Regions:
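Two-component system phosphorelay core
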Residues: 1-140
C-alpha cells in the first residue's frame, strides 16, 4: 500500500462485537472503553452518545474538506476522530483515522481506498453504537 499503513482488518479478530457475535471482529471494544472511565457505565454511555453525534458532523465536514482539497482540515478532523475513537475503544476506526491523518503529510499519494476504508469503518462504528445504546444499561 502506498501509505505504508494497513487498512485491512488485523490478522486475528479483536474479539466479539457488542452484539455478541463471536465471528464478527470487534468494531469498538466496550471493555477498553470502560477501562478508560474506571468502569463507570453511565459515564461511558454518555461519552459514546456524544461520540456518535460528533461523528456525524465530523464525517460530513471531512467530506467537504476532501472535496475542497483542504488537506490541513482533513488532517485536523482525522486527528479529532482518532482521539475520540481511542476514547471509546474503536481501535479500527482509530487506526483508519491515523492512516488518513498520516496521508495528509503527502496528500498527492492519498488513495481513494484509504478514504473509503475510513468511511466504511466510521459507518460500522455508528451502527454498532446504535446497537450498544439500544441495550439496557448493565448489558454491555
Amino acid at each position: 500500500e502506498t501509505l505504508g499503513v494497513h487498512s485491512e482488518s488485523p490478522a486475528r479478530p479483536l474479539g466479539q462485537s457488542v452484539r455478541g457475535d463471536s465471528a464478527a471482529p470487534k468494531v469498538f471494544d466496550t471493555v477498553a472503553g470502560l477501562r478508560r472511565v474506571d468502569g463507570d457505565v453511565s459515564l461511558y454511555r454518555k461519552i459514546v452518545r456524544l461520540f456518535s453525534k460528533e461523528m456525524v458532523d465530523d464525517g460530513e465536514q471531512l467530506k467537504v474538506h476532501l472535496l475542497h482539497r483542504d488537506w490541513k482540515q482533513v488532517a485536523d478532523t482525522a486527528h479529532k476522530v482518532k482521539g475520540s475513537a481511542s476514547t471509546i475503544g474503536a481501535q479500527r476506526l482509530e487506526a483508519e483515522a491515523k492512516g488518513l491523518q498520516q496521508a495528509m503529510k503527502s496528500p498527492e499519494t492519498l488513495r481513494e481506498d484509504r478514504v473509503d476504508a475510513f468511511f466504511r469503518e466510521l459507518s460500522a462504528v455508528q451502527e454498532e453504537i446504535s446497537h450498544f445504546l439500544d441495550l439496557p444499561e448493565g448489558h454491555q
